[in-house]
């Protein structure tokens, strides 16, 4: 058996990644793609390895021969403009007719386990296929009950709902010499004579299936890692997937600050979610209107403020809608100066917007980071602050001050001419009924009050980037509306606000389910040896690590070994102890997290 490597079948170079070299010369863990592939193949003592394509001037022959391979290596160059997989196969036809062959694209990186299974697979022609992932560009396959390929869909199929439940080719194949000579080659030659269209290897297989009722056996990707590198983004993702440096993997993944759909095999306990909302019906309504929303401009601030006012029951002049709460935090914080009170640990986006000289910090030192309105008043009453900022429930502790106590704080700040900014991004999750301060009567009574709310966090739609700020200080609200862009939210976010009211009952049901799951999750965490659970009223739980467990070590182990993101709190809390903040997801995900923590901390299966 031999291995045929199709060198740079796409014929592209990765701009800004490696300007002088093709994809196969990119380095991963210190070695190039082609060197990695050749070393993997060399382990199996093939009769020969044939590299097909490329230009002799690129030096791939000299580079490959310098590796001291045990397996003989041959080269077939292609100096013509044609460089499709089909043309490269045709260039190697004499080799392919001589013996059975593995066929590989040179832009692939994969685990050796996948190569081993392909070599041992049975069939005249075998294709490695994988469950669809949104980065895959191979052909979609149609399978019979024996998992044989009986057809190929177009490479750029537009039915992505079907794609999610489908399989695609990977660029790894095994051909018998007889099949290639008697079946594939005649159709390949005929196709190349009659068509100038660049096509993939699957094109001829599809013709053979239709013309000769041929079957293609399959080898499934299981837990194997693999990636096809076609551009700078692929190179970045593959670096993360295959890096041997655990610290580098952690830094790259956490440093992206989102976009984790690129890593579908990972579970995110870093960012905060609403596990039981939005409902399928709401999502389907968004999908049904996708095309209209994609091609239509959103409304301006006036219309969107009206939608937000309708949804939250306040006057239009008292509310501004933002591209996430972060946009509104930046805007409102630019309006305040002077001594500003913060209760810490807290959400750092607020204090980061002011100078250190303006900070008046109240560090909470109680065992569970609990505090109430009286604690706040007693601490700040002689500090001469002009602004006070409070996240309620607090992030990361989950501490909550009830509505009655908040009224006491409202009165104290008003009487002392202190601006009070309350972040209620997590208030919907508390056990208290009707806890919010977003009520027109409250706003009218307290002109010093500004309430921020992240719709992304509360309603489980972070991709829409939505937030609101309400206040009866209409001058500040009017200024903020001019400060942000007139089209600061997109059509999808606007449409969500337009239909949200129809699903309010569903939202309340989802919150009830969530509160039950929060209780269950906290109880399960208490059973994990080495964790101390801090009671929370939010959609996250803060835990202290005991017995000398290092938070950064645990974060890396959970990421690398268990494919779970978790958040450490070392930069927020300065008491020398180790803490985590864990999102609360649905019961299935929470069970997976608990099991993973037990495995990592105590080697429990």
Residue ranges with predicted function:
Residues 515, 528-562:
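Conserved PLP-binding catalytic core of the aspartate aminotransferase-like
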Residues 240-296, 384:
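N-terminal "arm"/small-domain region of PLP-dependent enzymes with the aminotransferase-like
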Residues 1-20:
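N-terminal nucleotide-binding beta1-loop-alpha1 segment
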Residues 111-195:
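Conserved core of the sugar-phosphate nucleotidyltransferase
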Residues 369-433:
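Active-site phosphate-binding strand-loop segment of PLP-dependent enzymes
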Residues 165-169, 277-279, 300, 448-527, ...:
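PLP-dependent aminotransferase class I/II
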Residues 327, 334-391:
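PLP-dependent aminotransferase-like
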Residues 60-145:
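Conserved beta-loop-beta/alpha segment of the NTase-like Rossmann-fold superfamily
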């Amino acid at each position: 058996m031999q291995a045929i490597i199709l060198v740079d079948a796409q014929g592209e170079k990765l701009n800004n990644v490696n300007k002088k070299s093709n994809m196969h010369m990119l380095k991963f863990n210190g070695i190039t793609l082609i060197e990695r592939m050749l070393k993997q193949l060399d382990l199996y003592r093939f009769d020969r390895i044939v590299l097909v394509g490329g230009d002799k001037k690129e030096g791939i022959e000299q580079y490959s021969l310098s590796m001291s391979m045990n397996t003989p290596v041959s080269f077939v160059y292609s100096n013509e403009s044609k460089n499709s997989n089909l043309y490269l196969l045709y260039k190697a036809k004499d080799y392919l007719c001589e013996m059975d062959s593995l066929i590989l694209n040179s832009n692939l990186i994969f685990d050796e386990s996948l190569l081993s299974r392909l070599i041992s697979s049975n069939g005249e022609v075998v294709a490695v296929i994988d469950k669809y992932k949104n980065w895959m560009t191979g052909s979609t396959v149609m399978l019979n009950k024996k998992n044989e390929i009986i057809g190929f869909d177009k490479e750029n199929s537009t039915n992505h709902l079907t794609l999610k439940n489908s399989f695609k080719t990977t660029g790894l194949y095994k051909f018998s010499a007889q099949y290639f000579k008697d079946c594939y080659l005649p159709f390949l030659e005929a196709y190349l004579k009659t068509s100038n269209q660049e096509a993939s290897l699957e094109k001829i297989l599809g013709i053979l299936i239709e013309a000769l009722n041929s079957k293609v056996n399959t080898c499934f990707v299981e837990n194997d890692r693999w990636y096809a590198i076609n551009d700078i983004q692929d190179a970045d993702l593959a670096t993360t997937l295959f890096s041997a440096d655990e610290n580098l993997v952690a830094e790259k993944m956490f440093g992206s600050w989102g976009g984790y759909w690129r890593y579908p095999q990972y579970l995110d306990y870093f960012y905060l979610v609403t596990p039981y909302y939005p409902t399928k019906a709401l999502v389907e309504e968004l999908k049904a209107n996708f095309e209209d929303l994609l091609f239509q401009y959103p409304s301006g601030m006036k219309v969107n403020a009206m939608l937000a006012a309708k949804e939250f029951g306040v006057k239009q002049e008292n509310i501004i809608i933002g591209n996430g709460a972060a946009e509104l935090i930046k805007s409102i914080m630019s309006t305040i100066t002077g001594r500003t009170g913060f209760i810490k640990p807290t959400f750092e986006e607020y204090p980061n917007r002011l100078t250190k000289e303006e900070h008046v910090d109240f560090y909470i030192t109680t065992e569970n980071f609990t505090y109430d309105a009286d604690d706040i008043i007693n601490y700040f009453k002689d500090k001469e602050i002009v602004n006070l900022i409070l996240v309620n429930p607090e992030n990361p502790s989950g501490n909550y001050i009830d509505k009655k106590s908040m009224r006491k704080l409202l009165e104290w700040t008003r009487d002392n001419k202190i601006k009070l900014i309350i972040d209620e991004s997590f208030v919907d999750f508390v056990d208290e009924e009707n806890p919010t301060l977003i009520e027109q009567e409250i706003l009218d009574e307290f002109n010093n009050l500004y309430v921020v709310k992240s719709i992304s966090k509360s309603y489980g739609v972070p991709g829409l980037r939505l937030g609101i700020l309400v206040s009866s200080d209409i001058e500040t609200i009017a200024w903020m509306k001019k400060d942000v862009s007139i089209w600061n939210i997109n059509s999808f976010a606007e449409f969500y606000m337009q239909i949200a009211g129809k699903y309010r009952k569903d939202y309340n049901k989802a919150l009830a389910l969530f509160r039950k799951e929060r209780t269950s999750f906290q109880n399960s965490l208490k059973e994990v040896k080495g964790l101390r659970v801090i009671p929370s009223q939010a959609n996250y739980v803060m835990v202290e690590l005991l017995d000398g467990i290092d938070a950064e070590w645990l974060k890396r182990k959970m990421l690398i070994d268990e494919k779970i993101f978790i958040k450490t709190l070392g930069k927020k809390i300065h008491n020398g102890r180790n803490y985590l903040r864990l999102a609360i997801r649905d019961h299935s995900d929470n069970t997976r997290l608990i099991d993973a923590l037990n495995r990592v901390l105590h080697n429990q299966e």
